Structure formats: C-alpha cells, structure tokens
Amino acid sequence: MSERKAVIKNADMSEEMQEDAIHIAAGAIDKHDLEKDIAANIKKDFDRKYHPTWHCIVGRHFGSYVTHETHNFIYFYLDDRAFLLFKSG
C-alpha cells in the first residue's frame, strides 16, 4: 500500500475509527478500480467490525445531506476521491 495523505473534512467518530476508515479506504483503493467496489469494500468492513448498518459513498463529484447515528460519521479525502462513511439504520 503506497503512502497516502488523508484530509478529514468533517468527523463525528473516535480517532481510532477515523484511522480505521482511512486505512480501510487506502486498502480498498489498492484492491479495486471501480468506486462502487471501493465503497462496497469499506461498507462491508465497517459492518463487520462496527456492526451494521453502514453506508459509504466514494467519488469525485457529489453532494450529500444525510442523517447519521451519533459518533458514526466521517467525510474525508484520500488521493483525488472523497469518502462519506456513516452509520444509519
């Protein structure tokens, strides 16, 4: 896995979970070419580790307005992609 710089734009989760999100996202980028597959990888890992139901959006151009559970939200950039990861439901 190459060294990447993450820029966290907004987060409502523990430092440990934030680091985990970035680490999992970096691994998903290395494994997958399609953004939908990257998002699915991150979502499944977070469902497994932090219990369902997580939602993940990955892309270069999108807007969002979501409701999330307290302490279960992060929005960050890694490389040239934005990542929105949150738990709801």
Curated annotation (Swiss-Prot):
Acts as a non-catalytic accessory component of a dynein complex. InterPro entries: DLC_sf (IPR037177), Dynein_light_1/2_CS (IPR019763), Dynein_light_chain_typ-1/2 (IPR001372). The gene is DLC. One of its GO terms (biological process) is microtubule-based process. Belongs to the dynein light chain family. One of its GO terms (cellular component) is microtubule. Keywords: Cytoplasm, Cytoskeleton, Dynein, Microtubule, Motor protein. It holds the Pfam family Dynein_light. It comes from Schistosoma mansoni (Blood fluke). GO terms for molecular function: dynein intermediate chain binding. Tegument. SMART domains: Dynein_light. This is Dynein light chain. It is found in: Cytoplasm, Cytoskeleton.
